[in-house]
Design a protein with these regions (language model features):
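C-terminal transmembrane bundle of multi-pass solute transporters/carriers
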Residues: 13-21, 29, 198-338
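C-terminal ends and interior cores of transmembrane alpha-helices
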Residues: 37-51, 239-252
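Transmembrane alpha-helix termini and helix-breaking/packing motifs in multi-pass membrane transporters
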Residues: 46-48, 105-128, 196-199, 301-321
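Paired small-residue
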Residues: 53-65, 255-262
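Cytoplasmic helix-loop-helix junction between adjacent transmembrane helices
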Residues: 59-102
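A single, central transmembrane helix in multi-pass transporters
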Residues: 119-126, 163-218
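Helix-loop junctions on the cytosolic side of multi-pass membrane transporters
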Residues: 128, 132-153, 331-338
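Juxtamembrane intracellular "pre-TM" segments in multi-pass secondary transporters
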Residues: 141-176
């Protein structure tokens, strides 16, 4: 199982930036459609060939599909809003999308249980195939604004697209800030462990994790309001989030779940605003590529969370929150208008 997860992770890392380039040079909408088809293919492989070769092949195509969505999704939404003069609404739209991604896990988990009882593994597999294909069909309906030629940002190859992220004024620091900030989201993998350590009964651990997820959804949904706060607010909220995370971990009581929940809500509010600030800085012709560069950084930064947890648990991860705050302050501040 670990080998399969590693294969999935490596595939996503290797495909992250190239798929962003593909979306920029071909079609962001097309990339989303292709992602849905590939993810459906992954479920087909897992359903008809549930052995090691089938699962390995499925994880490869699933990893490529996930990478296709990573940069293309945000780029398509931002440029679509910009085309109608509504780019200022992106943070609210992105926050609502992030919140929905968390909330939809609840009914899908319940439905999966019903499907398993009704038809077992195969029924769940084919239902997943149908869902992915339906998502691909829906993606064909997304509006994609026509490409506008930009004299100083021509259609660029991979190397020049990446160098854009590294050299454009104000963009490199934003990419770094979002990469490190996004990597902190790996803490969600440990919420069940934290709940057990806080004394939550084993049977109630899923409910405790659900509380944290709901708080995260609320934070993401309120990101639009957080975006209007003073410049110091984002790093301040991140520091507060880290403090609550540490306090919740050190307080060995089930009520500490509330502290972790508020921590996660604050964190996701900051993350959504940060990702929106990055989009404000990225030139349109390479938007998906640069977003994918940040996504690659997020995957790398998540390793810091895993390492910190191994060294000192949640309090050590909280230190990463504190270390990230200055990066957020520097990389995600709004440019001064003169």
């Amino acid at each position: 199982v670990s080998a399969l997860f590693a294969l999935w992770s490596v595939t996503g890392l290797l495909a992250e930036v190239p798929t962003g380039v593909l979306a920029d040079r071909w079609s962001r909408r097309g990339a989303l459609v292709l992602a849905g088809v590939l993810e459906a293919a992954g479920f087909v492989l897992w359903t008809v060939a549930p052995g090691l070769p089938g699962f390995a092949a499925g994880f490869v195509v699933w990893g490529i599909g996930g990478a296709l969505v990573s940069g293309a999704g945000e780029a398509l939404v931002y440029d679509g809003l910009a085309a109608v003069g509504a780019e200022g609404s992106y943070v609210r739209v992105h926050g609502a999308t992030t919140a929905t991604e968390l909330l939809v896990q609840v009914p899908t988990a319940l439905l999966a249980g019903v499907l398993v009882g009704a038809g077992g593994y195969e029924l769940v597999g084919w239902a997943s195939v149908a869902t992915c294909l339906a998502a691909a069909a829906l993606a064909t309906r997304f509006p994609e604004p026509p490409r506008t030629g930009d004299d100083d940002e021509p259609d660029v190859p991979l190397r020049r697209a990446v160098s854009t992220a590294l050299r454009r004024p104000g963009l490199r620091s934003a990419v770094v800030a979002v990469a490190v900030l996004g990597g902190l989201d790996a803490i969600e993998e440990y919420f069940p462990v934290m709940a057990r350590e806080q004394g939550v009964a084993t049977g109630l651990v899923p409910a405790a994790v659900l509380v944290v997820a709901l708080a995260g959804a609320a934070g993401a949904a309120l990101a639009g309001r957080a975006a209007g706060l003073p410049a110091r607010a984002l790093p301040g909220l991140l520091l507060l989030s880290g403090g609550l995370l540490a306090a919740g971990a050190l307080w060995g009581h089930p009520a500490a779940v509330a502290a972790v929940a508020v921590s996660y809500g604050l964190y996701l509010a900051v993350l959504v605003v940060g990702e929106a600030r990055l989009q404000e800085r990225v030139p349109g012709p390479v938007r998906a590529t640069v977003t994918s560069v940040a996504g690659l950084g997020i995957e790398a930064a998540s390793l810091l969370v895993f390492g910190a947890w191994a060294l000192g648990g949640a309090p050590a991860v909280a230190v990463l929150f504190a270390v990230t705050a200055p990066l957020v302050a520097r990389g995600l501040r709004r440019p001064v208008v003169t």
